[in-house]
Amino acid sequence: MEEEVAALVIDNGSGMCKAGFAGDDAPRAVFPSIVGRPRHQGVMVGMGQKDSYVGDEAQSKRGILTLKYPIEHGIVTNWDDMEKIWHHTFYNELRVAPEEHPVLLTEAPLNPKQNREKMTQIMFETFNAPAFYVSIQAVLSLYASGRTTGIVLDSGDGVTHTVPIYEGFSLPHAILRIDLAGRDLTDYLVKILMERGYLFTTSAEREIVRDIKEKLCYVALDFEQELQTAAQSSQLEKSYELPDGQVITIGNERFRCPEALFQPSLLGLEAAGIHETTYNSIMKCDLDIRKDLYGNIVMSGGTTMYNGIADRMQKEITALAPSSMKVKIVSPPERKYSVWIGGSILASLSTFQQMWIAKSEYDESGPSIVHRKCF
């Protein structure tokens, strides 16, 4: 493989797709992982309506489209739509010919075996990639933070995982998954705003609520205390202007929404909160490495971007951990993109170049080669 050809790094999240070139410090393209199809028959002939739209274009025409997310809970469930997203990534966003660049894709922890095979097959057969590799998202986030040991709490739009990693290897028996992430918090905010009399029903209006969530929500250090403060004064209230000019006011919803991460029972889910899940994950690991994990709890993903989340996590885990244990929460400012950044670092390492699956190897062994080469 010649030096000058940059590898492509694509982090396919449930909510957003992050794509760019290895060696860059940030992704070139970040767009929603959505495919939209027209809800109505086009009436104006020659308008050039397409039968499907991807990413930002689907987002901007959302009023007339039905939006679908091909990745649910971090795992690809609709391969035809996924192919459209990859096609869009190569040809419209990065403007590259995929047959000229090695491709590094990311996958969710505990991704089913046949899924990695399918990804491998599509990259080699549909897009003719010269070389390919697939890497676990949480491991890449840890690389991006400059560590090889730690526990990653990765929470995006579709799924949350706690992944303990020791010397660069994830420990599958201790990985825990919670199907509670950004999308569920958006749904929950829709619900609690409804109690205030604000109705958001269409998929387009839910995107507005997502924006409200990202701009105004935060995690309370002490939830009960914060509720009292909110009830007694209006200092926590903020206003938000809707696209039609109407202004809405939001108060305790600001911290009630992300509180569901710590108390999933608010959503009617019988799951442990992110703090308890992180602790449970650590407890599934060998006694000897727990100290290293407590001292390196790394946050990653868009749903860890709330103000106050690291302090709250510190407080909750310190309460669960043995009293003498040093607990350290690492929350890098670029954690929204740390999976992608880790991929960019990995794919540009000189030692990594012999790790790629070459097209010739694929042609010889078929899709199952991915299990031998990528672990």
Curated annotation (Swiss-Prot):
InterPro entries with a match to the protein in the record: Actin (IPR004000), Actin/actin-like_CS (IPR020902), Actin_CS (IPR004001), ATPase_NBD (IPR043129)
UniProt name for this protein: Actin
Main enzyme class: hydrolase
Annotated catalysed reactions: ATP + H2O = ADP + phosphate + H(+)
Family assignment from sequence similarity: Belongs to the actin family.
Taxonomic lineage of the native organism: Eukaryota, Fungi, Dikarya, Basidiomycota, Agaricomycotina
Keywords: ATP-binding, Cytoplasm, Cytoskeleton, Hydrolase, Nucleotide-binding
Pfam families: Actin (PF00022)
Entry's Gene Ontology cellular component terms: cytoplasm; cytoskeleton
GO molecular function annotation: ATP binding; hydrolase activity
SUPFAM superfamilies recorded: Actin-like ATPase domain (SSF53067)
Assigned EC number: 3.6.4.-
Superkingdom as given in the UniProt entry: Eukaryota
Annotated function: Actins are highly conserved proteins that are involved in various types of cell motility and are ubiquitously expressed in all eukaryotic cells.
